[in-house]
Curated annotation (Swiss-Prot):
GO terms for cellular component: cytosolic large ribosomal subunit. Keywords: Ribonucleoprotein, Ribosomal protein, RNA-binding, rRNA-binding, tRNA-binding. Part of the 50S ribosomal subunit. GO terms for molecular function: rRNA binding; structural constituent of ribosome; tRNA binding. This is Large ribosomal subunit protein uL16. The keyword rRNA-binding applies. It comes from the Bacteria. InterPro entries: Ribosomal_uL16, Ribosomal_uL16_bact-type, Ribosomal_uL16_CS, Ribosomal_uL16_dom, Ribosomal_uL16_sf. The gene is rplP. It comes from Alkalilimnicola ehrlichii (strain ATCC BAA-1101 / DSM 17681 / MLHE-1).
Length: 137
């Protein structure tokens, strides 16, 4: 699963996820993309589940890019532990998705195959998504 090799600090504050994606909002590498429409955190497990769903559907054809990386540590205290005594340990890693962010890209497959692969990946994700094509300028 995806997670940083090393970080400057082990834990982060929760923060807030405002605004629209100003970076990573265009299809850059492949022909087709899966773009987020709503906001929310996506965990490393969800990113991996979506990647597996895409790869299983396209089989050996096409190339897939993952355009998000979970670099935000999410902490949790153990079950049945009283509050206080400091912040909990890192439980998992997540990526805060903003509307307009491209999550996955694919090339080398037909549009119908890409649509179906992204539909299956979208079922694994906690945000609503839409299918986008690369725009040639």
């Amino acid at each position: 699963m995806l997670q940083p090799k090393r970080t400057k600090f082990r834990k982060q504050q929760k923060g807030r996820n405002y605004g629209l994606a100003s970076r990573g909002n265009a299809v850059s590498f492949g022909e087709y993309g899966l773009k987020a429409v709503t906001r929310g955190p996506i965990t490393a497990r969800q990113i991996e589940a979506g990647r597996r769903a895409i790869n299983r559907h396209v089989k050996r054809g096409g190339k897939v890019w993952i355009r998000v990386f979970p670099d935000k540590p999410i902490t949790a205290k153990p079950l049945e532990v009283r509050q206080g005594k400091g912040k909990g340990n890192v439980d998992h890693w997540a990526f805060p998705v903003q509307p307009g962010r491209v999550l996955y890209e694919i090339e080398g497959v037909s549009e119908e195959l890409a649509r179906e692969a992204f539909r299956r990946a979208a079922a694994k994700l906690p945000v609503r998504t839409t299918f986008v094509q690369r725009t040639v300028l």
